[in-house]
Swiss-Prot record:
Organism of derivation: Salmonella typhimurium (strain LT2 / SGSC1412 / ATCC 700720)
Residues that bind ATP: 35-42
Gene3D superfamilies named in the record: P-loop containing nucleotide triphosphate hydrolases (3.40.50.300)
Lineage: Bacteria, Pseudomonadati, Pseudomonadota, Gammaproteobacteria, Enterobacterales
EC number: 7.3.2.3
Catalytic activity: sulfate(out) + ATP + H2O = sulfate(in) + ADP + phosphate + H(+); thiosulfate(out) + ATP + H2O = thiosulfate(in) + ADP + phosphate + H(+)
Quaternary context: The complex is composed of two ATP-binding proteins (CysA), two transmembrane proteins (CysT and CysW) and a solute-binding protein (CysP).
Boundaries of every ABC transporter domain copy: 3-237
Top-level enzyme category: translocase
Keywords, comma-separated and alphabetical: ATP-binding, Cell inner membrane, Cell membrane, Membrane, Nucleotide-binding, Sulfate transport, Translocase, Transport
Protein name: Sulfate/thiosulfate import ATP-binding protein CysA
Amino acid sequence: MSIEIARIKKSFGRTQVLNDISLDIPSGQMVALLGPSGSGKTTLLRIIAGLEHQSSGHIRFHGTDVSRLHARERKVGFVFQHYALFRHMTVFDNIAFGLTVLPRRDRPTAAAIKTKVTQLLEMVQLAHLADRFPAQLSGGQKQRVALARALAVEPQILLLDEPFGALDAQVRKELRRWLRQLHEELKFTSVFVTHDQEEATEVADRVVVMSQGNIEQADAPDRVWREPATRFVLEFMGEVNRLTGTVRGGQFHVGAHRWPLGYTPAYQGPVDLFLRPWEVDISRRTSLDSPLPVQVIEASPKGHYTQLVVQPLGWYHDPLTVVMAGEDVPVRGERLFVGLQKARLYNGDQRIETREEELALAQSA
């Protein structure tokens, strides 16, 4: 079932928490709402579920406006971060609960409920724990019970609010893989909230990055990493090096070094330069691609590559994090050379286009 979010705004008193949000989610897609605390991601999820009401705008499921429908009428499954299991009920009864409280005309027979719950217990690999109570379960087991309970009523849309946030790292990884496999099998439309970049990019078909009530970028996970649409996305998604400097003519001035850009940007003045660790050119010998001297202050072998922290020698004050391929690990104190050719330049939040981008803009004008 598709979800259409059309010009949603939400205020709490004088505080605007969602600013004219629009997003289309095709049927069967798994979408991550990713952002820091206060970005509006959980509020948006709750509005989709009907647990909060928007100040303006519309929510449509498969073309039908559900904006005024109560949460129970929207027929979505919702999984909370802290499980929200009934402590006095067994695992079996927790999963069955949603079926037992359906209106009489929609309620399955006791035999059908038993069959359904048994199938769900097998699916979430907890059949042997059917008679246990929540207090007797691990965090990962509780989350599986919560997910099975949400799936019991056969929702066409599944919503999850930081479903793995309360679990330890190893259990989170296992449950992420399991949820992705389950999604592939059942093909339900799913939206989940997370602040974990790795979780979002590993599980979701599409990542929606949010900040201060706005959507910064909605894209495939790899594109969000490699082609960030805004400065916020660039800085939020993983580690990035930032250097401050100035563009003058066709050169970038950083500290005591002048680095030729190979073209003269339309913008001239102060800029911030950004490179992810793997975008920094690095070698043991100086060259046109790697002219800037650095000294290794930390080296962390990672198998087929080494993550380095290097200190620029005479041309910048802050250390950089870089990645060097190969098994020949540099040692602390070793002198290397880096290049910044793959950098992105920003003036505040405004991206400074490369020569190719400026030419493309001129041709399209």
